[in-house]
Amino acid sequence: MSVLRFATRRGLSWCYASRLTHQGTSVTSGEGSPGTRTSRVPARVLNLTRPLSCRAYNSKVPQSPTWEPVSEDLLPPCAQFPADLVDKLERLALVDFRTKQGLECLEKAIRFADQLHVVDTSGVEPMDSVLEDRVLYLREDEEKEGDCAEELLQLSRNTCEEYYVAPPGNIPLPTREKRAAMLKHSEF
């Protein structure tokens, strides 16, 4: 039984119970684990508790930011990009860097990523997965509502024979010569 359904059966209004469960509050009835019924506890007595993973109680999350700006002296020198490399980046990312503003944005993004070169990673093993050493607690798969395929298909823009239709794939950008012909009066 879901916590929301349990809380509403125990006398909480649906609106209040859903607000509590969305805030991460667990609802228990007296002694026992969350969601268990006990006959000794009146229906109106509920213990509402917040999990210990709240920000105030989590010791792994620092209370203040630990980020410090990196001086420009420690960063590698700024790289100049040949036109061929910019064309390749445009084709792969499907982003247009035709203007000076686009190139400046690209240079700033690369300069920001250069700060990773300063990080000391000696003695740190590479991580294959974020969840590699953790136990994953999964809930049981319970069907909440059934026969809602028609409702879900109505949410899609394109359907064909009760299947979702994916949008068209990436459209490649025109070559540099074609773009040069199109943009004779551009700043780039």
From Swiss-Prot:
Enzyme class (EC, first level): ligase
Q: Does the keyword Glycoprotein apply?
A: no
Q: Which UniProt keywords apply?
A: ATP-binding, Ligase, Mitochondrion, Nucleotide-binding, Protein biosynthesis, Transit peptide
Q: Which GO terms describe its biological process?
A: glutaminyl-tRNAGln biosynthesis via transamidation; mitochondrial translation; regulation of translational fidelity
Transit peptide, first to last residue? Answer: 1-11
Q: Which reaction does it catalyse?
A: L-glutamyl-tRNA(Gln) + L-glutamine + ATP + H2O = L-glutaminyl-tRNA(Gln) + L-glutamate + ADP + phosphate + H(+)
Source domain of life is: Eukaryota
Entry keyword Lipid biosynthesis: no
Query: Which subcellular locations apply to this protein?
Result: Mitochondrion
This protein's major location comes to mitochondrion
Mention any one GO cellular component term assigned to this protein in its UniProt record.
mitochondrion
- Gene Ontology MF annotations: ATP binding; glutaminyl-tRNA synthase (glutamine-hydrolyzing) activity
* Alphabetical list of InterPro entries matching this protein: Asp/Glu-ADT_sf_sub_c (IPR036113), GatC (IPR003837)
Q: Which Pfam families match?
A: GatC
E.C. designation(s): 6.3.5.-
What family is this protein classified in? Belongs to the GatC family.
Could you tell me what this protein does? Allows the formation of correctly charged Gln-tRNA(Gln) through the transamidation of misacylated Glu-tRNA(Gln) in the mitochondria. The reaction takes place in the presence of glutamine and ATP through an activated gamma-phospho-Glu-tRNA(Gln).
Subunit and partners: Subunit of the heterotrimeric GatCAB amidotransferase (AdT) complex, composed of A (qrsl1), B (gatb) and C (gatc) subunits.
**What is the protein named?**
Glutamyl-tRNA(Gln) amidotransferase subunit C, mitochondrial
What organism is the protein native to? Tetraodon nigroviridis (Spotted green pufferfish)
Q: Which gene encodes it?
A: gatc
